[in-house]
């Protein structure tokens, strides 16, 4: 796993996002958990944002196509958003195995408010109280990227690349010192 680590030292608040290719295998999840442990052991606060496992969203889209030629956009958002929830839970299990307190959060629980453009929603604002509460309890919030909720309570997805957008928006809202976008790559060009 490649993750550019900053040289900032002094109890930084870091938002770190892991993409789908980084959360596909158990050894990757364990590596992410160990990196998170190192981060908090040096005194930093950490928010993790995760994508669905590589190929998972496409698989869920194919599942919908098996039963309908024209599913509603809101139903599709409910279906394809579950991949991120699975990644959050899997990572939480790995962190808990290392004795690291954490709490998983859907986009809704994280307070990510969007417009109603299902399948390609835009973040309007973030109500970060729950993320701040978890950080204040010295836990790692693990936020499902790609998800949000309308002001009417309807689940939305942000479209491809939405987990990156989620991480940057959370970092901005929390005035984080660092926002890291991590991936599983052979090298950096």
Listing of model-derived features with the role each one plays in the protein:
Residues 5-189:
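Nucleotide/pyrophosphate-binding catalytic subdomain
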């Amino acid at each position: 796993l490649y993750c550019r680590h900053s040289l900032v030292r002094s109890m930084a608040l870091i938002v770190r996002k892991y993409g789908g290719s980084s959360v596909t295998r158990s050894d990757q999840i364990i590596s992410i958990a160990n990196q998170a442990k190192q981060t908090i052991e040096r005194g930093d606060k950490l928010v993790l944002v995760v994508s669905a496992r590589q190929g998972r969203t496409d698989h869920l889209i194919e599942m919908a196509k098996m039963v309908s030629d024209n599913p509603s956009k809101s139903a599709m958002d409910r279906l394809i958003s579950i991949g991120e929830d699975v990644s959050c839970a899997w990572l939480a299990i790995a962190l808990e195995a290392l004795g690291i307190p954490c709490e998983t959060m859907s986009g809704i629980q994280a307070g990510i408010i969007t417009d109603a453009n299902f399948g390609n929603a835009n973040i309007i604002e973030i109500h970060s109280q729950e993320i701040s509460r978890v950080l204040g309890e010295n836990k790692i919030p693990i936020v499902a990227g790609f998800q949000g909720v309308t002001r009417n309570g309807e689940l939305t997805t942000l479209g491809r690349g939405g987990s990156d957008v989620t991480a940057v928006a959370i970092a901005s809202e929390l005035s984080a010192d660092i926002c890291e976008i991590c991936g599983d790559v052979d090298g950096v060009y």
